[in-house]
């Protein structure tokens, strides 16, 4: 009796699955729409830190790396950027400010940065320049709080 699940057949099946996954066109959503409204930054340093650590997911200025076009990584990256833009988009600043009625935006940002939730660890592995020192984290938290207060 022939075995159906031999290592060779499993390997061939896995390769076919990877090939077929490439036909799901998530890269069509890898867009950078024009900015609606931008924050009035409290300082150029705050802006530079936000660009370095936040803008790839939380703005319409995403730099889409080559691996964002290859499945299954493209699915994860597209989902993360869409989610990041939905929660906080620096290029749609007025919408971000209007959503802070339940929990103030500066407190949300402070909590996530100080807990090490943002930027996520898997992001900083691929983007080591996004890693912020403790001083830079505090400077970003303080600068964003001032930027939010200035509206």
Q: For each predicted feature, which ranges?
A:
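Hydrophobic membrane-insertion alpha-helices, especially the h-region
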Residues: 9-25
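Short cysteine/histidine-rich zinc-coordinating motifs and their immediately flanking basic loops
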Residues: 66-72
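The canonical Cys-X-X-Cys-His
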Residues: 50-62, 118, 140
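Electrostatic cytochrome c docking/interface patches
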Residues: 29-50, 63
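Extracytoplasmic electron-transfer domains, predominantly the class I c-type cytochrome c fold
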Residues: 75-126
